[in-house]
Amino acid sequence: MNRIDKTLEKLKANRKKMLSPYITAGDPYPELTVSLMHQLVKSGADVLELGIPFSDPMAEGPVIQRAMERALAHSIHCDDVLNMVRQFRKTDTETPVILMGYLNPIEQYGYDLFAQQAVEAGVDGTILVDLPPEEADGVSRVWQKHGLYSIYLCSPTTSAERMNFINQHANGYLYYVSLKGVTGSDALKLPELKAQYLQRKAQSKLPLMVGFGIKTPEMAAQVAEFADGVIVGAALINEIIEAYEAKKDPLQASGALLSSMRQAIDNIGSMV
């Protein structure tokens, strides 16, 4: 069984919501990434999302764009990201790792070789932001051959037809994009978000995790009251880079934010 499914089953049995942090591999410097991954697990992460740096990250806001620029300045590419996962797996064989990014670097790598190497390294799935499910047939077949999960995005504007298509091809869970625009966007409107989320939830065979716009422990808890889980990216990267630039400890800063989110989410009580 894929680690993602094992984790989701465990969360369901314990009546807990998923917390998934996103960091960009190699940011703010390559030697920190594996330590950050372990720190985030220690601080309450259920699933890790590790970004593959890319020069044209169209869905990302300024925070993650800059993170990718910093990583690319260190010449971080697919092989480096896979090596980071290999290092992480030396002492953590249970926490799911999702690689999030864009199709171009993987296309250049070669789909079959990438999937083979990713699974060997200990990757559990991918989120490819610019690969819509209707165009993913070739990639999906390769991923299935190697046991790599395809995790898709859906949003308030996703049609019923596309949701049906996603239900036929997706594995693990869905990444619910809570806001129009880019990562790190403006404040969430919770009543509207809840209504739109529940519409998609009724159409989905898989759990829906809410990303984009989760900035504070309070916000994470408010969303987790109705959602299957939350994903935090830009807010976490802000904490990491601010600590690094202030010559403070990025591990402590990232761990403090994630721990407070974990506690706030767990304090909402049993799953709805």
Swiss-Prot record:
> Pfam families under this entry?
Trp_syntA
Q: Give the source's domain of life in one word.
A: Bacteria
Per the record's keyword annotation, is Lyase included, yes or no? yes
Could you list this entry's UniProt keywords, alphabetically sorted: Amino-acid biosynthesis, Aromatic amino acid biosynthesis, Lyase, Tryptophan biosynthesis
Catalytic residues of the enzyme: 49, 60
Recorded GO molecular functions are:
tryptophan synthase activity
Per the record, its GO cellular-component terms are: cytosol
Q: What class of enzyme is it?
A: lyase
Question: Which pathway does the database say it acts in?
Answer: Amino-acid biosynthesis; L-tryptophan biosynthesis; L-tryptophan from chorismate: step 5/5
Q: Which reaction does it catalyse?
A: (1S,2R)-1-C-(indol-3-yl)glycerol 3-phosphate + L-serine = D-glyceraldehyde 3-phosphate + L-tryptophan + H2O
Question: What's its EC?
Answer: 4.2.1.20
Keyword rRNA-binding annotated = no
The record describes its quaternary structure and partners as: Tetramer of two alpha and two beta chains.
**Function text:** The alpha subunit is responsible for the aldol cleavage of indoleglycerol phosphate to indole and glyceraldehyde 3-phosphate.
What family, per the record? Belongs to the TrpA family.
Protein name per UniProt: Tryptophan synthase alpha chain
Q: Which organism is it from?
A: Legionella pneumophila (strain Lens)
